[in-house]
């Protein structure tokens, strides 16, 4: 009896198909309609102009240096135009990379990383809008108040009698209807 169970387990485990080491994405074009998003015609619906070149690209240059102190430098270049390089140490790093986009334009990003965080720079990156004038004025007023010893912690302090800064009045004694 044990022999039959043992042989059955061996037979089942040896017949099981091992998972493939290759990633095969799900069929993205399985719709019933022909065309770029449908399943008829063999198109997956996810094609980019340089996709075939990327599949067959090779590494044409690669460098890697690591020192005992923790400093390092690495870089590589591929046959489809992707380039990357980085140098740094335990506390900070700087580097960059470039690639050719779907539109044929080469995009380059340069970055530093360290105590101040990750700081990328590139012409294709969005830029924050300018700070509105009212916000700049409020920030300057906050700096003046802090220099004068006035700190607003966001809490209500009845001992201030409604005054947030010297000379300001919150309507105390004006008949505003709010009395504490």
Curated annotation (Swiss-Prot):
InterPro entries in the cross-refs: Cuticle_Struct_Prot, Insect_cuticle
Compositional bias per record (Basic and acidic residues), positions renumbered to this chain: 45-55
Gly residues bias: start-end ranges: 170-180
Signal sequence coordinates: 1-15
Pfam families, per the entry: Chitin_bind_4 (PF00379)
Keyword rRNA processing: no
Keyword RNA-binding: no
Gene Ontology MF annotations: structural constituent of chitin-based larval cuticle
GO cellular component: chitin-based extracellular matrix
Alphabetized UniProt keyword annotations: Cuticle, Signal
Region (Disordered): 23-76, 146-180
Annotated Chitin-binding type R&R domain residues: 69-129
PANTHER family: CUTICLE PROTEIN, CUTICULAR PROTEIN 47EF, ISOFORM C-RELATED
Task performed by this protein: Component of the pupal abdominal endocuticle. May have important role in the pharate pupal cuticle structure.
Protein name: Pupal cuticle protein 27
Organism expressing this protein natively: Manduca sexta (Tobacco hawkmoth)
